[in-house]
Design a protein with these regions (language model features):
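Amphipathic alpha-helical interface elements
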Residues: 1-134, 138-228
Length: 228
């Protein structure tokens, strides 16, 4: 139910706008992160015409098809690169996407299912994330009304759940993809499950600045770092 004071009382309006903004920011990043994590599992970074691509990118395959059609040649023949890219993309689509019916958020839903199948998230967490997606849609499409209604403890729990699951997916990605790809070794005694990605740290910092009154603390730390 709309509460008129939520629009005109600063002590009500500002926190509600902060929650809405952070919720949407976190969710959009979370969805991108989920999709990219699964894509990276199947893909290989590559360069073409001086531009970085993933070998399963449609843009990369389209560009290779154009070069093959025009009869261009390369150090590795473009026909071979095209065949490899098509094969890699077909495996990704079969294992991550084809099990999900076409519709809104198909790539995201397929990626969540893949993470569940590989024991990165649980079935309950998968269902929870899809429910959070529904809440995100409410905020994006009915933001004016939702600010008028205000936010509940359940919205705070949704934010906490996203932060928690995101950190765990990033830790899994670090162990399964990044460590071997970048030849990273953790210090002795470090727990790889506790690893936080740069995005985890930034989003946690934003949370603490917005909701925990730690803006000055982060400002001072940044100022000290910039002096180095």
């Amino acid at each position: 139910m709309l509460q008129i004071e939520n629009y005109f009382r600063e002590e009500e309006l500002v926190p509600n706008v902060k929650v809405a903004a952070y919720f949407i920011l976190l969710y959009e990043h979370f969805e991108d992160m989920v999709i990219e994590t699964v894509r990276e599992f199947y893909s290989t970074p590559c360069m073409l015409d001086g531009k970085p691509f993933s070998n399963i990118d449609k843009e990369y395959i389209d560009l290779l098809e154009k070069k093959v059609k025009q009869g261009e040649s390369g150090w590795i023949p473009f026909k071979i690169r095209l065949a490899d890219a098509r094969r890699a993309r077909a495996v990704y689509q079969k294992e991550a996407l084809d099990k999900v019916k076409k519709g809104s958020g198909r790539i995201f839903r397929g990626s969540l299912n893949w993470l569940q199948e590989h024991d990165v998230i649980t079935e309950a967490e998968n269902d929870r994330i899809l429910a959070i997606r529904d809440r995100r849609n409410e905020l994006v499409h009915e933001l004016f009304q939702e600010i008028g209604k205000g936010f509940s403890d359940e919205d705070a729990k949704r934010i906490a759940d996203m932060l928690n699951v995101q950190q765990r997916i990033n830790a899994w990605k670090f162990q399964q993809i990044d460590m071997s790809l970048m030849e990273i070794e953790l210090p002795e005694g470090a727990n790889p499950n506790d690893v936080m990605g740069g995005d985890d740290m930034i989003l946690n910092a934003i949370f603490r600045i917005l909701f925990c009154g730690e803006g000055e603390k982060f400002k001072e730390a940044l100022d000290e770092e910039l002096k180095k």
